[in-house]
Regions:
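Extended, charged alpha/beta regions that create polyanion-binding interfaces
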Residues: 1-50
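Short acidic, glycine/proline-enriched helix-loop-strand junctions
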Residues: 120-144
Length: 231
């Protein structure tokens, strides 16, 4: 009996535990990846605003709010920084700038990133009086900083810094979430729990399939699509 007990404790028990633990990890991985893919799908298939003239805002306190004005195709027409919040508190100057830009570039909608100072920036924007009806949206910033530092963004905007590129990405996400988000490695969009703990090969495969199926579902306008949508 002693020998059997010893053999069980020394040999069998550890191998059963290892196997059980591996099975549990696999199950947990599958579930986490399923949730991650579902979240990504929701983000990619968010309803696009379409071809409208958009102002993109990457909000901030000390560093100011980066403003970009985009035409209906998402091309950058203008960029500047305003400081409506502490510590600079240049509120009235910032308000004048915003109202002027909305009029000058005939802006139809404003996209505000959901990061630092987002709520205060939304309040600031909605409390101004404009010469037109404006839609104001708060947009997920996840992955925008990854995009703005990427080769893709550098190729498109070589003469602008990362903050301007980030604001452009926020504005474009409102116009066409799918077209903008496919430029970013899906794992960087940050819509999953424990994404660094799960099997990375499985995760990549699942996310690639999700992106592909969303692009196939929505279809692609060959005249306006970027190479990221077509590959």
């Amino acid at each position: 009996g002693e020998a059997v007990r010893d053999a069980y404790k020394r040999l069998l028990k550890p191998s059963i535990e290892t196997e059980f633990s591996a099975l549990s990890k696999e199950k947990a991985d599958e579930e986490a990846i399923r949730v991650f893919a579902g979240n990504l799908r929701q983000l990619l298939l968010a309803p696009p605003l379409g071809q409208k003239r958009v102002m993109g805002i990457d909000p901030g306190y000390r560093t100011g709010c980066k403003i970009v004005c985009l035409d209906a195709q998402g091309s950058l027409l203008h960029n500047e920084t305003i400081y409506p919040h502490p510590p600079k508190n240049e509120y009235s100057q910032a308000a004048r700038s915003i109202v002027k830009l909305v009029e000058q570039y005939q802006i139809e909608a404003i996209a505000i990133g959901n990061g630092t100072a987002s709520r205060e920036t939304e309040q600031f924007i909605t409390s101004q009086r404009y010469d037109r009806e404006l839609q104001v949206f708060v947009v997920s910033e996840d992955g925008a900083s990854i995009y703005s530092a990427s080769k893709t963004a550098r190729d498109e905007f070589p003469e602008y810094d990362v903050t301007v590129r980030g604001a452009v990405s926020i504005g474009r996400r409102l116009m066409d979430p799918l077209a903008e988000l496919v430029k970013i490695d899906a794992k960087s969009i940050g819509v999953g729990q424990y994404q660094h703990d799960v099997d990375q090969t499985l995760l990549k495969k699942s996310l690639d399939q999700t992106v592909e199926s969303c692009v196939n579902l929505v279809g692609v306008n060959l005249n306006t699509a970027s190479r990221h949508l077509l590959t």
